[in-house]
């Protein structure tokens, strides 16, 4: 009974496309990040701006753009993990995805395949869009598309060939025909072990090229079998289901892996060579890329082995057919770019060469493992988007591509002899010079336009202090005091770094003050500078003025109303006038606070909104009044005439905004984007109405806002016949939010503390669409969560410039900020870890916030953080001026000292030596050496993130695990000390037995080095031992520690002489991959045989097997999941499944607990690299010790597994079933299929699956009517209980902030 919740969305761009999917007028890029589909548009400033984003229920394996019938927009073919193809298009009315066609192939593939299917299929689209294929292992599905060649119009321009676009389609004709599913051998009997399959160009019928290997071979048996790779070209007759062999090539090198169809031929990419094949199927040329390339191939060979290039299967390519050239650029795993030059005359190849593109700047310094590339290029210029597994996705400008086609120039260079200085010394002639020929190439200009933030792959994580290291800032308590963050290691190679995940905003504190009394503050700017600070105390009915530029000296203003409660303050008339709105009236002053005008109001004013020259206020009786500053003498208030209908409406709040959302209803402004002043009000029945300055008694309304519908429309307001006041909307804001690119949003704050947002449609200015992307729960309706709004009133404040961002702040006991990055949707974050009572703008881009104990802080947004994901992300670079540490692996937090311990691994040249230190037999020094590893440990101080100590391990070593744990040092006194335990392995060649090392360290305080106050801690080595077998995992167990030593689990006890003595052991079947403990219990995972549940007893020392998993998981990571005394386990395997098992000795089929009960299995869309147990925050009920599990993954995402009690699980299960049954899934991605369908489904409890919070949180943003329908089906009091359950999930990690 658990729920899976993704707390950080994927960041790795695994697929990107260039084309018009949602707009024909703007250049667009369609980007997939695991299960998040985004559409970016290119702004005038050449930046990527997010237009739309959808979170699907399954992983996007591949996608291709197809022409759409009768439209300039493309439709999208999406391939999911279950060999399912979805054809979708953009729906301009709902501004969402519309599914046109769904095609399921997985079950047929399973029935037809003679071997196990791969986890991911291959999809390819015919260049003329006649059909589409899906291939997996040895089965193939062909989906005919009803877009014939006569229906295509192909425009050719000067630089390249555009994609065909569909013109018309016959009536009653669908977009697809019936799929053809067959074994690959049905195409030709010799087809086996297919490496790549692609559709080919310039054929009248659909034609495929297939790279396959009928007899598997590798370097070990290559001398016996020879080259067994083959290439075949087949023409397909889709209607008659016949094939014709056009060409076949045999005896190709065994390292070929990728086929690239060109306009006039094909290129086969191998690890060690490149082959060119003509359109007729003749092998015409080969390029040797390194000394390992084959020389026994019968064709013209170009020897480029001195380039020493290795093109692994992870290399990607970009191809575009230009008018006179084939533009083919390869990018290898180290992000080096190569241009493949092909020139031909007819079918005769005249030039085939590979040239490394000379990039001047180190633009790819921090990038590794490219995954996808797309863009629009010609010979002059172009833009491309490249997604990497490690490093930010880059939007690049490429200039002067002609350089890539230019041959290297040969220059004659004069070189002085090396012995010239000796000749001069002995008086000999110094004219000893000679010449040499040097090949040069012009540098290639490439510049970064924009990037998409990426922190993947995440390899390890820990919990530690980041922003709360300093207890006080500016003599006041740190607003993030006692707060812990998730710190993870990210990336591969030179771009590896630490990533800190913050659940709250951690701002820079520029200034701090202490007030004696203040419930609201205002900052009055005169001539653009902060001049006066006005405070008011609602309890004492008093107000004060301070001079900011005179160190906050009280200002003696005789006319200023100090004895009244101030409701609003603002400057008017270009900062020449100051307006004070008190509970009793309006007062107008000059800049020296000399009174110019006064307007007394009989009824108490409770709210005011001031936008020059208008003043809108509401009184205690709910009446609305608007006054205008006289435009002539600026010393008189003129009453603004309100529409007649307002006299019959109950108003709860009012504001003034600037917007153009109703321009199409205004005469003369139908096509204008000019913003108008809108006087906006919330009525007692939760309608939002507004009118303009020249309203002519005409009022507009937002239809559907009272029920929080998915789409709001603007129409003329009609007074209802019967009004039932039941106010739930407290305040609305209509503002532009964003960073460089501002977009208009409607923000709704309810009396229950909920925050809802609507975005103005880009297609229709009078329509607003609800924002549903990963909502944050901030409150609950129907007084279900009064704790969030009781102590301090929640009020929304808009700031147009907060460090360059336009944001909305919401004050309260738990304050929030609404912020938007240009390349992401709007996000809501908690603002610091303290309550905020009031706030005001400060300086040019800061705010002053006052907390509940009258402390005022001037806060500025941290520019080093990224606010576009569901958590605030901060990249922390660990570097040394002398040395690069490359990949950061494991991380641990030393709680006693507050330091971080990080392992690093960098590549070195591997020395193939035997155990005696002699070169191995068969070692060839003329060949390039393989790469080895060198690891070490870094001690990091989070105050400065500097390296204060390091410990280097020997060559060919790799750190596998680091843990900090309380270890018992004396069995009599039971004294414990926090130590660091490290397990490592020595990486050698396969003929040598594996060995490892156990290392025990302490961190001691020392005298800091001069000029380095942060270097006050050092490593102290206590114990080291080289061990036969690799040390893969370490964990604490009852004051001792266990090490996974290859297939043996060994418990060691620390002695007073710092020796680690083995006291108990247990043999595992194959190889220990991970081990975790809870009290005196332990689980040990095996690489092939599942895991074992073990108990440890210290008197006498022994390890007792309590239970084993019956399924033979290939365990990656595992963790305990303890809830109310029940012991559950979660396990992730190499097939990206997450399994939940339970120790249940009372169940009959468990054999008294010896067989662990398999509860359910859950599909994950990426590889899990690490899991950690964290204490759970309990918002409701008894404060028992419950735990949740955190896991980090390769695609940059982080999840949590949260255990539920029986009642909560039942409610959630009913809600999930209702949502899945009645809500149409986006792009046809069915949650049950994508998450639960796997080979272990029959072993679990089908009615007790792991729940998906992505589905459950849809309930939050359902319209009120649909929400009520679900609540009625769940049961009595379901509304309150469901919100309690959702809040309990949302706030489960508040244990990191020490919040109540």
Swiss-Prot record:
One of its GO terms (molecular function) is RNA binding. Keywords: mRNA processing, Nucleus, RNA-binding. GO terms for cellular component: nucleus. Its main location: nucleus. It is found in: Nucleus. One of its GO terms (biological process) is mRNA processing. InterPro entries: Beta-prop_RSE1/DDB1/CPSF1_1st, Cleavage/polyA-sp_fac_asu_C, RSE1/DDB1/CFT1/CPSF1, WD40/YVTN_repeat-like_dom_sf. RNA-binding component of the cleavage and polyadenylation factor (CPF) complex, which plays a key role in polyadenylation-dependent pre-mRNA 3'-end formation and cooperates with cleavage factors including the CFIA complex and NAB4/CFIB. Involved in poly(A) site recognition. May be involved in coupling transcription termination and mRNA 3'-end formation. Belongs to the CFT1 family. This is Protein CFT1. It comes from Kluyveromyces lactis (strain ATCC 8585 / CBS 2359 / DSM 70799 / NBRC 1267 / NRRL Y-1140 / WM37). The gene is CFT1.
């Amino acid at each position: 009974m658990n729920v899976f919740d993704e707390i950080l969305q994927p960041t790795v761009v695994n697929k990107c496309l260039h084309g018009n999917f949602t707009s024909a007028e703007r250049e667009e890029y369609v980007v997939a990040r695991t299960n998040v589909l985004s559409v970016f548009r290119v702004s005038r400033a050449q930046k990527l701006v997010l237009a739309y984003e959808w979170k699907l229920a399954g992983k996007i394996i591949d996608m291709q753009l197809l022409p759409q019938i009768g439209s300039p927009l493309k439709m999208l073919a999406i391939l999911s993990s279950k060999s399912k193809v979805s054809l979708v298009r953009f729906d301009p009315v709902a501004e969402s995805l519309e599914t046109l066609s769904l095609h399921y192939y997985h079950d047929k593939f399973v029935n037809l395949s003679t071997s196990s299917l791969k986890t991911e299929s291959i999809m390819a689209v015919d260049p003329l869009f006649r059909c589409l294929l899906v291939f997996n292992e040895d089965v193939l599905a062909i989906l005919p598309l009803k877009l014939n060649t006569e229906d295509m119009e192909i425009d050719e321009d000067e630089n390249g060939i555009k994609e065909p676009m569909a013109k018309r389609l016959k009536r009653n004709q669908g977009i697809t025909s019936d799929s053809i599913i067959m074994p690959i051998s049905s195409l030709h009997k010799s087809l086996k072990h297919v490496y790549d399959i692609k559709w080919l160009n310039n054929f009248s019928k659909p034609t495929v090229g297939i790279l396959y290997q009928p007899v598997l071979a590798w370097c070990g048996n290559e001398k016996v079998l020879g080259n067994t790779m083959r290439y075949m070209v087949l023409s397909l007759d889709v209607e008659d289901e016949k094939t014709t062999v056009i060409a076949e090539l045999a005896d190709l090198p065994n390292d070929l892996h990728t086929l690239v169809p060109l306009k006039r031929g094909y290129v086969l990419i191998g690890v060690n060579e490149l082959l060119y094949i003509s359109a007729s199927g003749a092998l015409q040329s080969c390029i040797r890329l390194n000394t390992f390339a084959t020389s026994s191939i019968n064709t013209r060979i170009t020897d480029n082995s001195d380039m020493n290039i290795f093109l692994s299967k992870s290399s990607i390519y970009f191809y575009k057919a230009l008018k006179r050239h084939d533009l083919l650029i390869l990018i290898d795993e180290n992000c080096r770019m190569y241009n493949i030059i092909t020139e031909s005359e007819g079918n005769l190849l005249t030039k085939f060469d590979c040239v490394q593109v000379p990039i001047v700047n180190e633009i790819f310094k921090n990038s590794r493992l490219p995954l996808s590339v797309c863009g629009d290029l010609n010979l002059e210029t172009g833009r491309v988007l490249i997604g990497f597994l490690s490093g930010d996705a880059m939007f690049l400008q490429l200039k002067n591509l002609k350089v890539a086609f230019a041959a290297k120039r040969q220059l004659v260079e004069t070189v002085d002899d090396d012995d010239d200085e000796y000749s001069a010394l002995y008086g000999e002639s110094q004219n000893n010079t000679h010449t040499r020929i040097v090949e040069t190439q012009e540098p290639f200009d490439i510049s970064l336009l924009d990037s998409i933030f990426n922190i993947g792959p995440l390899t390890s994580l820990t919990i530690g202090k980041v922003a709360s290291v300093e207890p006080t800032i500016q003599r006041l308590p740190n607003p993030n005091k006692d707060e812990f963050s998730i710190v993870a290691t990210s990336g591969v190679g030179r771009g590896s770094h630490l990533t800190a995940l913050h659940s709250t905003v951690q701002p820079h504190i520029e200034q701090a003050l202490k007030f004696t009394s203040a419930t609201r503050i205002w900052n009055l700017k005169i001539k653009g500078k902060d001049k006066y600070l006005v405070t008011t105390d609602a309890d004492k009915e008093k107000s004060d003025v301070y001079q900011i530029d005179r160190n906050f000296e009280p200002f003696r203003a005789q006319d200023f109303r100090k004895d009244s409660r101030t409701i609003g303050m603002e400057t008017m008339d270009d900062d020449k006038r100051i307006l004070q709105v008190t509970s009793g009236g309006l007062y107008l002053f000059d800049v020296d606070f000399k009174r110019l005008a006064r307007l007394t109001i009989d009824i108490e004013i409770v709210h005011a909104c001031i936008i020059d020259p208008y003043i809108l206020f509401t009184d205690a009786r709910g009446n609305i009044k608007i006054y205008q500053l006289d435009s002539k003498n600026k010393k008189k208030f003129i009453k603004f005439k309100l529409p007649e209908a307002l006299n019959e409406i109950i108003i709860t709040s009012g504001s003034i905004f600037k917007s153009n959302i109703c321009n199409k209803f205004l005469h003369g402004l139908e096509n204008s984007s000019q913003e108008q002043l809108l006087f906006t009000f919330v009525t007692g029945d939760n309608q939002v109405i507004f009118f303009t300055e020249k309203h002519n008694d005409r009022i507009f309304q937002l239809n559907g806002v009272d029920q929080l519908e998915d789409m709001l429309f603007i129409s003329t307001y009609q007074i209802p016949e019967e009004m039932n006041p039941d106010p739930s909307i407290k305040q609305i804001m209509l503002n532009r939010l964003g960073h460089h690119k501002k977009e208009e949003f409607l923000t709704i704050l309810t009396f229950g503390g909920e925050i809802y947002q609507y975005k103005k449609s880009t297609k229709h200015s009078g329509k607003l669409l609800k924002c549903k992307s990963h909502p944050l729960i901030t409150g609950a309706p129907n007084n279900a969560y009064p704790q969030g709004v009781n102590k301090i009133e929640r009020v929304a404040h808009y700031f147009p410039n907060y460090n360059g961002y336009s944001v909305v702040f919401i004050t309260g006991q738990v304050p929030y900020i609404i912020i938007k990055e240009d390349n992401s949707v709007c996000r809501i974050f908690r603002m610091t870890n303290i309550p905020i009572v009031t706030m005001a703008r400060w300086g040019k881009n800061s705010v002053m916030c006052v907390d509940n104990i009258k402390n005022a802080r001037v806060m500025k947004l941290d520019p080093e953080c990224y606010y576009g994901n569901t958590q605030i992300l901060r990249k922390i670079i660990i570097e040394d001026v002398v040395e690069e540490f490359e990949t950061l692996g494991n991380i641990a937090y030393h709680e006693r000292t507050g330091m971080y311990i990080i392992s690093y691994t960098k590549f070195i040249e591997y020395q193939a030596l035997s155990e005696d230190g002699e070169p191995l037999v068969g070692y060839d020094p003329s060949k390039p050496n393989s790469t080895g590893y060198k690891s070490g440990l870094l001690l990091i101080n989070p105050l400065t993130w500097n390296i204060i100590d390091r410990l280097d391990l020997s060559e060919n070593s790799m750190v596998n695990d680091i843990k900090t744990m309380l270890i018992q040092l004396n069995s009599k006194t039971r004294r414990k000390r926090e130590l660091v335990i490290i397990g490592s392995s020595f990486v050698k060649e396969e003929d040598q037995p594996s060995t490892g090392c156990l290392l025990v360290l302490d961190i001691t305080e020392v005298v800091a080095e001069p000029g380095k106050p942060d270097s006050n801690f050092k490593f102290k080595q206590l114990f080291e031992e080289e061990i036969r077998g690799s040390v893969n995992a370490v964990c604490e167990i009852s004051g001792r520690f266990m090490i996974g030593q290859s297939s043996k689990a060994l418990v060691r006890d620390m002695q007073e002489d710092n020796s680690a003595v083995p006291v108990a052991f247990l043999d595992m079947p194959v190889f220990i991959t991970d081990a975790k403990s809870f009290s005196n219990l332990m689980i040990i995972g095996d690489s092939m045989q599942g895991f074992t549940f073990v108990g440890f007893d210290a008197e006498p020392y022994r390890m007792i097997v309590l239970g084993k998993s019956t399924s033979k998981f290939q365990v990656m990571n595992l963790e305990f999941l303890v809830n109310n005394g029940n012991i559950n386990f979660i396990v992730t395997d190499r097939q990206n499944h997450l399994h939940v098992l339970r120790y249940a000795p009372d169940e009959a089929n468990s054999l008294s607990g010896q067989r662990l009960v398999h509860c359910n299995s859950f599909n994950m869309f990426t590889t899990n690299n690490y899991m950690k147990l964290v204490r759970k925050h309990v918002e409701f009920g008894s404060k028992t010790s419950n735990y949740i599990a955190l896991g980090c993954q390769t695609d940059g995402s982080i999840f949590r597994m949260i255990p539920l009690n029986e009642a909560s699980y039942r409610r959630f299960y009913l809600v999930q079933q209702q949502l899945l049954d009645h809500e149409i899934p986006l792009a046809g991605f069915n949650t049950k299929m994508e998450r639960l369908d796997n080979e272990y489904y029959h072993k679990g409890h089908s009615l007790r699956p792991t729940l998906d919070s992505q589905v459950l949180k849809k309930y939050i943003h359902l319209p009120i009517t649909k929400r009520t329908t679900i609540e009625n089906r769940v049961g009595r009091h379901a509304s309150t209980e469901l919100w309690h359950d959702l809040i309990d999930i949302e706030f489960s990690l508040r244990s990191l902030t020490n919040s109540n």
